[in-house]
Regions:
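Alpha-helical recognition segments enriched in aromatics with Gly/Pro capping
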Residues: 1-31, 46, 117-335
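N-terminal, positively charged nucleic-acid-binding surface of large information/translation enzymes
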Residues: 6-102, 459, 463-464
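Alpha-helix C-terminal capping/helix-coil junction sites
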Residues: 53, 99, 127-128, 254, ...
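Short phosphate-binding/catalytic loops that engage adenosine nucleotides
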Residues: 57, 131, 452
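Short, glycine/charge-rich beta-strand/loop segments that flank catalytic centers
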Residues: 65-70, 91-94, 104-119, 137-146
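The substrate-binding groove and active-site-proximal loops of carbohydrate-active enzymes
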Residues: 76-83, 107-113, 225
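Structural preference for alpha-helix termini/caps and helix-kink/transition segments
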Residues: 265-268, 273-468
Length: 468
């Protein structure tokens, strides 16, 4: 498993004598309905969790909600209601959407407001040990200079951070890099008691406190989006290792790649360039959306490209996912099948080898599609039913490890054009091998006239999508 901290893949061996993996994932700040960028992270972490359980690991998974935050307060004020009900609504929205995407629930969902006493205790411990300091205003800051390893996760040096952070200091703040652990109360905002006066936590301290309380001083896996590497996760390390004196705070840092728009811009609530999952699910099925998210390696960025005009907007990658799922459904077929029985061990071994290499879902799906083609060959050649069923059973089994159930949304439609397009593309591939370029181009052009866009890939393969 790759870790952002070390920059390499290492064997995943449980840290603790009980053999249970401790996995903490930074959850959502419930300030609005979740968008596809959120789904990217949480589906990726769900695949990691599912695969580890499938491989026999025992695991406890905790994922927080940051239910008090400047942006939630702003949303509540805009909607003219209280902060608590605002956060509660969007937490429920998140859970409902993740359920539709077949994301398994965490073992615990701690909230900032529910762990306030523990957060205050954690801050007090940092102050007592000399790693944090209170100022006259009632704010408390972490003393970055007291932690020599600061920057080791994001691979930044302290001098460059000092230059980047240079600005007018808040009253009493010693260093521009120091970050808030506790913020004094502001009029009209929720606040809690503390030794430094009423206020609320800074952003980073909450996860250190909740992770420690629910999972202990050291974690096997800590997940989140790549945009959290700095400053959030960097600050978590500084806080946690300063308080406990134990290294590493986390052995494997798993960061999912960001969802970027066609122009390369990150999708985010703050940039107001997001598309909610509910909106996407008005056009696509949850299975199609999940496949789209799973098909790219979790550490790679994922391009989200909208096409078409108002009233008929499509997502290219999900259109491709729709076609891929159709091919898998067609291979599975509609014959009755018992899921109890032997599996195709060669396919299982190939799938495991791919996923064992830092959860390489693209390679794992390649194994699954090889299996689908083998099923089609068996069916066409009249292979023994037991042989066909063994492969069909394996297809379902491996897809379910990825949280993909091709039986969940019905069989492929009888009128599907996919087998005919695939056949034409196979003929076109052979023509290209024979350097019959004109005929190959004619097939591509004629398919285009019928609304089928063909894209040639490096290495000689082709993909296609139906323009609706």
């Amino acid at each position: 498993m790759y870790s952002t901290l070390t920059g390499r893949e290492d064997e995943l061996v449980p840290l603790h004598p009980d053999g249970v993996l401790r996995m903490y994932v930074c959850g959502m700040t419930p300030k609005f309905h979740p968008h596809i960028g959120h789904a990217r992270t949480f589906v990726a972490m769900d695949v990691i969790r599912r695969y580890l359980l499938y491989r026999g690991y025992r695991l406890k998974h905790v994922q927080n909600f940051t239910d008090i935050d400047d942006k939630i307060i702003e949303r509540a004020q805009r909607e003219q209601r209280d902060v608590e009900s605002t956060a509660r609504e969007y937490m429920q929205s998140y859970l409902a959407v993740m359920d539709r995407l077949n994301v398994q629930p965490a073992d615990a969902y701690p909230t900032v407001t529910g762990f306030m006493e523990r957060i205050v205790e954690f801050i007090a411990g940092l102050v007592e040990s000399g790693h944090a300091y209170a100022v006259d205003t009632g704010d408390v800051y972490f003393d970055v200079a007291s932690f020599p390893d600061y920057g080791k996760l994001s691979h930044r040096d302290l001098n460059s951070q000092l230059v980047a952070a240079r600005k007018e200091l808040e009253p009493g703040k010693r260093d521009p890099r120091d970050f808030a652990l506790w913020k004094r109360a502001r009029e009209g905002e929720p606040a809690w008691p503390s030794p430094w006066g009423r206020g609320r936590p800074g952003w980073h301290i909450e996860c250190s406190a909740m992770a420690r309380e629910t999972l202990g001083d050291q974690l096997d896996i800590h997940g989140g989006g790549a945009d959290l590497i700095f400053p959030h996760h960097e600050n978590e390390i500084a806080q946690s290792e300063s308080l406990t004196g134990k290294e590493p705070f986390v052995r494997h840092w798993a960061h999912s790649g960001l969802v970027v728009l066609g122009g390369g811009e990150k999708m985010a609530h703050s940039l107001e360039n997001f598309t909610t999952i509910d909106t996407i699910l008005e056009r696509y099925t949850p299975l199609e959306v999940r496949y789209f998210l799973v098909a790219t390696h979790y550490r790679s960025s994922l391009t989200f490209t909208l096409e078409g005009e108002a009233g008929d907007v499509r997502v290219r990658g999900i259109e491709d996912a729709r076609g891929a799922l159709g091919r898998l459904r067609r291979a599975f077929g509609e014959e009755p099948l018992s899921l109890d029985g032997p599996l195709d061990q060669a396919a299982v071994d190939g799938f495991n080898a791919a996923m064992d290499a830092d959860f390489n879902t693209p390679d794992a799906l390649a194994v699954i599609f090889d299996l689908a083609r083998e099923i089609n060959r068996c069916r066409d050649s009249g292979a023994a039913p037991a042989e066909l069923d063994r492969r069909r059973r394996t297809l379902v089994h491996l897809l379910e490890v990825l949280g993909l159930d091709i039986r969940a949304e019905g069989p492929a439609e009888q009128g599907s054009i996919e087998p005919y397009v695939d056949l034409l593309l196979e003929v076109r591939r052979k023509l290209r091998d024979l350097k019959q370029w004109a005929l190959a181009d004619e097939i591509r052009a004629r398919l285009g006239d019928l609304g089928v866009t063909v894209e040639d890939q490096p290495g000689g393969g082709s993909t296609w999508r139906l323009e609706r």
